[in-house]
Amino acid sequence: MSQSTRARTSNFARTLLRFLLVWVVDAISLLLTATLYAGISFAGIAGVPVIVQAFAATFLLSIVNLLIRPLILLLARPLGFIAVFIIGFLVNGAALLITSFLLPTFEVSGWISAIVGGLVFAAINVFLTGIAEANDDGSFYQGVIERLARRRSFTNIDPQTRGLVLMEIDGLSYHHLKKALADGLMPSLEYLMDNEGYVLSHVDCGIPSQTSACQAGIMFGDNTDIPAFRWYDKDKRKLYVSGNDATELNGRYANGNGLMRGGSSINNMLNGDADKSLLTLAGMFDGDAEEKKRRAEDVYLLMLNPYFLTRTIIFLFVDVVREVWQGWQQRRRDIYPRLNRLAHGYPFVRAITTVFMRDIAANLTILDIIRGAPTIYVTWPGYDEVAHHSGPWTGDAFKVLKTYDSTIARVYRTIRDKAPRPYDLIILSDHGQSFGPTFKQRYGISLKEFIEQLLPQGITVAQSMGGDTGVISLNAASGELSNIRDSGVGGIGGQVIAERGQRVLDNMVQEQESSDGTPEADKPAQVTAYGSGNLAQVYFDLLPRKISLNELNQAYPAMVDTLVSHEGIGIVCGYEDDGTPVVLGKSGRRNLHTGALTGEDPLLMYAPDAPDAFGHASLETRAWQVRRVMDFPHAGDLMVISTVYPDGTVAALEELIGNHGGLGGEQTDAFLFHPADMRITQTRNSADVFHILNDHRDLPLSETPREPADREDTADDWSLGNLWSGIKDVSSWMPLLARALVFDRLAYVEIAKSGKMTGPALLIGCVFAALAGGLRTASGLDTRAIFGNVAWWFVGVLAILVAGRLLNRSSGASYTQTMRAVGFAQAGNIIGLAGLIPPLAPLALFASTVYTFCT
């Protein structure tokens, strides 16, 4: 069988499997709708179970929808996506009425019942589809959207070189990802490790460990003079806030050689010289009318799928409820530390970052993969946002991380099945997150209040911390809605909704920023502390330049020494009279230019020796990182970093219990999850990651395919956790099942080698062996025949293994590997279902026997 024929056959099998899965979900949804809503019902027929009637009704409903969906798009598309959404629900009601007319046992009592029933059916269907992890791949609307997207393909597609798809999980540390993998929360990544030879590598992002500095480093190879997320420029007398000033920062580093040159930036702060940017703060309101219209049309394309919009809205509100529930559980159990998770509309901010931005960004990424963009960089901020408020080690954070695994799997399948060029999929983080009660929670006082106590009465102090949170995504979404409105895309209704949505998002941004304590322009302060996480840049207005420690001591005697001596302060960095930066600790002092030490090295707590320690790095690396920031022209007069406590936690200087921006703990422990042939060099700043990725970009295809390392079976393959984790990961084993059904030999090799396939193989083998036993029973339900057939199946697996060993003594296959392959092969018994129709029974038995022989 040729490769193209195999691909077409495999696609057909996948389509068939998807149809069967959707059919089952639709039947259950319709049955539940009839149970919950009186306007829809099934008339009882003697000897015909209601579930059979539900399957018949949904089959007819799918045919009706298939015929009228093109009409929906034809009529509604010129009116905008809101018209598609509304007309879609009206047509759902019409489809239910038509189905009730064609199938007398299915009853719908009028138009109102049809429309309301359609809404109930859609809501239940979305919920069940989410549980089954059945996405829109292969659906009618997705097919239309992808065909329209290809009309704007990238022109620089080279099928002989590798493209890059870079998926950033904001704020996920190397250590937290290792735990997620160990707990079976990321089966897609485990699949890539087992079958594609992927490797997880540690990256030190340096300081400041926050998004603007890290993305500038990763995307441009330069993040000079970004001393914190917020900082003050004494020369310009301007407060810089990375999110608000992303366009200026991007222009500082852009030179045409960024990582995404010629490619696409999706949901980022900076754009890496991308030709096309969406949901990216840098250049959000710049660009010509053509570029803005192209962005608006991409978002509009997604909205043509009413099910996508429905699902996203429903799951957004589900996540709001989940956050309220999790916050209540945290309070009920008196878990400490904790925050007020209802303040400033946080549940909605969380839902937008975890659900809305995830789904929108993932679908935009898929469109650009189909178009052949040379490099695509997309960020998901959901984990970072939840970890900030719940804590990075909590179940809340890991649960939301698990939801992103299916998104990774979907992008991987798109690369494998639909991309016009080869891609390397790389998962990475910009920085990690550290954990602990905040400075104020520990000591009952903020850094601002503590500094005020050390200054003469009348000296005003202001503090503005944070901002590297979900606010970035709110601003990005607001900007794209503004662009849709200004570009005239989406119809009148769509533009009205875009304007209202933008207003809501802008209000949410203002609410969030009001909690940051940004100094008001008409109330200048003499001392200001800016930054994020456990790092603050402190500026004094005594002089329009950097102020030395001696000058500060003369103006405010004992202030610096008292600051250093506080239990919660780890180091205070300042300047000698000649501008040389120094680090002050409780028991020592370090000259950052010469390395000269007095007493104990104050950086020691930030450089643990153990290779697996949180924040592991050499003293030389930490000294280089701190010196580099202090040498920035616009670093503060003082740089304050909180201490690392004996339990490994840190104290954020802002009110977030999961934090990043400075040193200590996991916040500098970023990661790269990459193909084995990617060369990883030592890193001490995110700018080093640029060179690693850029060197891998546009590489010619390898003449030999990558082979995953052979994997030995372990007892863990049969653990209940592994079995259940594999079974739940439908998005991984369903494509393999489709390929196995069409005799794809490579699929069977992947199945046999993957420990995650043990559970699915056991399920498929037992279910279809039982099915075969039941179908061979002439009358009634013979449980002995069913269980006997399952038992004989296990014996048959052993017989196949023994025969294979006798025929090929070099075979290294184990019983478990053989069981996996034979288990998936059992799916061919699905043909036997046709035997339930008496006239087709002999043909079904013959076809099933032939298929079993072929496998």
Could you say what each language-model-derived stretch is?
Residues 137-139, 221-374, 379-391, 494, ...:
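His/Asp/Glu-rich, glycine-adjacent segments
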Residues 140-197, 441-442:
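Active-site-proximal N-terminal segment of extracellular/periplasmic enzymes that hydrolyze or transfer
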Residues 179-216, 221-225:
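Short, structured active-site-proximal loop/turn typified by the sulfatase FGly-forming signature C/S-X-P-X-R
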Residues 239, 243-252, 262, 266-273, ...:
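Active-site neighborhoods of enzymes that stabilize oxyanions during catalysis
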Residues 406-446, 581-584, 639-641:
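Metal-dependent active-site segment of extracytoplasmic phospho-/sulfohydrolases and closely related
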